[in-house]
C-alpha cells in the first residue's frame, strides 16, 4: 500500500518563529511526531512518503504515486486539513484522518469527506483500521472507547521519512497524560490523568536513531508534563545522562512541566546534567483566585516567582504560558501579568485569551451555563489571535484590549532587552558542561549558519535600531557578570525578531475581530461567585 502522509499547514502563531527560522535557514520549528509514530505502527511492508505542508507543497508526482492518504492535525490546522482532504478526494484517493482535531471533534465539517476516521491513540485504533483496509472496506470510524494503551510497546518513530534539515528541532515523547485537572486543559481528555511512560530503553533507542540519521541539534520532549510521573522520569534521566556523555552531548533538550518541578532539587539537577536547557511552565496567571477557579491548584501551593528563580538557578531557562479571561477575573489582569513577567525576567511569555476547548471541563460547564458562543465543531483551538469563544464575566472588549496592550508591552524592544538581561544575570551555569571533557573534549564549534544569524541580530539590534546602546550595555554586563550564559543570552535576544512582527499580527487580527462583533453580541456574563476548591 503506497501511503502518503500529509501534515497540514499551521497559521502563524507565537511558536511559529518564522523570522528566527529564516536567520538559520530552516523552515519549521518542529516535525509531525504523531505522523511518524503512526508510520511506525502501520505494516512496514507498506511504501510510505511524508509531506509536511509547513515545509513544502505536495507534488503532482506524489499525488499520482499514492494509493492511500493519511492526514493528522490539531484544531488550529483544520482549515488546511480540509483542503488536503478535498484534494485527495478530487483524485479519487481514500483518506484516513486522525490526531487531536479528529479525536476531539470527529463530526466537524472539515472532516466530512474523509473515508476513515482513526480516533484516539493509534496503538489501539490503528490495528482496527489496518484490518478494515485488508478486508477491502471503503470506510470506517474507529475509537478506543476510553481505553488507554500501554506505550511501552510503541515502536521507534519513522524519523527517516522526515526532511530533517528543514527542522530546527526534533521531537520525541516519553509520557502521555497528566495527573492534574486544570479545567481548561484538553490533555487529560485526550490522554487521561494517569501518566503512562515509555521505558528508558525505548527513549534511548529513539535518540540513537536520530543520532544515526545525523541529527545533532536540539530535541523537544513533547510530553505535556514531563514530570507527571516523577518516579519514571527519575529512572530515565540517569540513562539519558550516560548516553549523552558517551556521545559527547550531541543534543540539548527542552520540555514542558508543571510548576512543582521547582520543589524537587534532585529532579532539576538530573535534568540539568542531561542538558535540558529550557522548560515550558503553564503559569497562566499570578492571580491566585483565578488559578483556583481554573482548578490549577498546583500553582497556588508556593511562590510562582520563587519557582521561576529556582529552576533558572540550575541553568534551565523558563518559558511560560499566561491566560487572560478567567471567570471572576478583575480588571488589570494584563498589567499584573506584565509585572510578573518583568519581575521574574521570563524571556518567552506566551499570552492568549482563554479558549473553551471541546470536551474539557470548562467546555461542559460553560455549555451548561449557556455561555458558549461557538459550536463544538467550530472551535478554533488555542492561538494568540483568537477572541474568547464564550461569554466572559467581564466585557470581551476590555479583556481583548488588556491582552493586546500586555502582549505589545512584553515585546517592546527596549523592555525585552531589559527583561532578558535581568534573567540571564541571575541564570545558573549549565551543569552538563562539566561532563564534556570526560567524553569528547571541547564541544563542537557553532556552525557558520548560526554565526551568521547572530551577526545579523547584532547588526539589527546593536547598530541599526534605536536599541543599540541598550543592546551593547546589556551584552557587556552579561559578559562581565555571567559569561557562561552569553551565547544563550544572544540567542534569546534574537527571538524578538519574531515577536516584533507578531505584535503587529496580534494587534491587527484582534482589532479586526472586535470590529466585526455585532452590536447585540453579548459582551459579558453576570459575575459568578468564585468557588474555592
Residue ranges and their predicted role:
Residues 1-215:
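Acidic, low-complexity intrinsically disordered segments
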Residues 2-5, 47, 62, 377-378, ...:
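Radical SAM enzyme core and accessory elements
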Residues 5, 71, 221-223, 281, ...:
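Conserved beta-strand positions
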Residues 10-16, 104-108, 230-231, 289-294, ...:
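Flexible glycine/acidic-rich beta-alpha junction loops that bind and position SAM and/or redox cofactors
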Residues 37-41, 239, 405:
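Amphipathic alpha-helical segments that form well-ordered structural scaffolds
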Residues 51-55, 145-157, 317, 329-352, ...:
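A C-terminal junction/extension of Radical SAM enzymes
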Residues 108-128, 270-278, 338-351:
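Structural recognition of alpha->loop->beta junctions
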Residues 155-319, 324-339, 367-368, 375:
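Radical SAM [4Fe-4S] cluster-binding motif and immediate context
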